[in-house]
Amino acid sequence: MTTLACRKLAPHPESPRHQHAGPWLVWLHGLLGSRQDWLPVAQLCGDYPSLLIDLPGHGQSVSLSADGFADISRQLSQTLQANGIREYWLAGYSLGGRIAMYHACYGRHHGLQGLLVEGGNLGLENAELRQARLQQDRQWAQRFRQEPLPQVLDDWYQQAVFADLDPQQREQLVLLRADNHGPAVAEMLEATSLGHQPWLLPALQRLNVPYTYLCGDRDHKFLQLAQQYQLPLHTLARAGHNAHRANPGAFAAQVLAFLSQSSCLPPSSLSR
């Protein structure tokens, strides 16, 4: 059994859930991140117990590898089992959002109560696009393996999806992410390339648990994606692609509102 490194947060002592084992919030970070990225939001959602997970190749799971989405979904299921988590809400950002969607659609997700996705890509609709993305991700992976990490990160955060960042914010992210292990990041990047990811929209539309799609109001790429495919979109003010980092208070408020609303819905209802 492969289990991912993780950290548990108990509910606040004054929370009505403190003495009762209710559904957990399980948090999946993005590429180059770690479980620490979710800590401010998880603490603001302190009425619920949280499990913050380090994905393979990241944080304290840096020595772990994964052979694609199905393998990571299995590792997630085994981690939940090892921690005694039977009912849970799954939240993920960017890469973590893609893994969360895959797990909800195709994984062993017994006990899943709902899905929260922040800026996660649904996949690519045809083989030509997938092949082009595989080639692009292989080029990035080669750089992560061979070049000094700060140099690669400088270019990584110049990508269009990070256009809302100012120079100071980019510099802060480069410094924050420079403690990653380049070859481990490269392996995870290749294993979870959009070129390997299935097109998730049809399966998402068949989900029998509530789900929501969160997006910063400056994240034009993913706003357009959510609107194009009529995802259950909620936006966050003054935020780009990494909305939970830019505006953790508003993000936590959206999470809590979704949980409160969804807990009142019949099991087959979708929060749309």
From Swiss-Prot:
Give the record's pathway: Quinol/quinone metabolism; 1,4-dihydroxy-2-naphthoate biosynthesis; 1,4-dihydroxy-2-naphthoate from chorismate: step 3/7; Quinol/quinone metabolism; menaquinone biosynthesis
Provide any one GO MF term from the record. Answer: 2-succinyl-6-hydroxy-2,4-cyclohexadiene-1-carboxylate synthase activity
Q: Which GO terms describe its biological process?
A: menaquinone biosynthetic process
Keywords, ordered alphabetically:
Lyase, Menaquinone biosynthesis
Matching Gene3D superfamilies, A to Z?
Answer: alpha/beta hydrolase
What's the EC number here?
4.2.99.20
What SUPFAM superfamilies does this protein map onto?
alpha/beta-Hydrolases
Question: Which reaction(s) does the protein catalyse, per the Swiss-Prot or TrEMBL entry?
Answer: 5-enolpyruvoyl-6-hydroxy-2-succinyl-cyclohex-3-ene-1-carboxylate = (1R,6R)-6-hydroxy-2-succinyl-cyclohexa-2,4-diene-1-carboxylate + pyruvate
The record, for Pfam families, names: Abhydrolase_6 (PF12697)
Return the NCBIfam families for the record.
menH_SHCHC, PRK11126.1
* Primary role: Catalyzes a proton abstraction reaction that results in 2,5-elimination of pyruvate from 2-succinyl-5-enolpyruvyl-6-hydroxy-3-cyclohexene-1-carboxylate (SEPHCHC) and the formation of 2-succinyl-6-hydroxy-2,4-cyclohexadiene-1-carboxylate (SHCHC).
> What is annotated about its quaternary structure and interactions?
Monomer.
The UniProt entry's sequence similarity note says: Belongs to the AB hydrolase superfamily. MenH family.
Q: What is this protein called?
A: 2-succinyl-6-hydroxy-2,4-cyclohexadiene-1-carboxylate synthase
Per the record, the gene is: menH
